[in-house]
Amino acid sequence: ESAIEQEVFGLEMGYGLLVLADNKKGGDLLDRITGARTNFAREMGMLLPTIGVRDNIELEPNEYRFLLRGKEIVRSSIMPDRVLAMSMGGGDASKLNGIPTIEPVFGIKAMWVPDEERRNAEVEGCTVVDPSSVLVTHLADVLKREAHLILEREGTQRLLDLIKDKNPTLVSELLPDLVNVGVIQRTLQNLLRERVSIKNLTIILETIADMAAVTKNPDDLSEQCRKRLGMYFVKEYESEPNKLLS
């Protein structure tokens, strides 16, 4: 069964990066990945499957890559024995003695420098992070970017089950008479594709229920959900009617 069932999302690393995941050597990468999954669920409202982490001898020692259903979607590298000094906040990493690179998420010019150069980098005004932070930040960005492809029928059903525990009337109104799970999945995927959080799932499902008599097209439904969510988002930031906080 395990041979048939394909892993949804995975991380593969070259052997030089394994020290980052070895807690006996002070590596906390696995804990950070768990934290990234938790933060993603809290921010985007989507339950993530377990992220498989393994070594791959075909990668260069300091390389890593993310896979979606077994297919590589991005590859990068970090230096486990150095820290990354980035040209942020007015700092200029090019003045430092190190190995030049580009930070993978923000595209910022950066320099891999020995840890003993951290203080000098900070004096130069650079932002300095450890290699595990670079990888986990990259992971978080990729998860958001690919969330719509990660969400499967089963994951959608799990979200519906969570809502059903608190709001059984809403779910029973929707399923199976108004729409099926596939329509809800594709509607949620449309929102996630635009990096719209689905954590306000009750509002989304209520909108689908309201509109289902008119249209069952996921594109139309997601557009209406986006508008409804936008109304609630604005209200959160209003200090008084029709006036946004400055």
Each model region followed by its residue ranges:
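Membrane-embedded alpha-helical signal segments
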Residues: 1-246
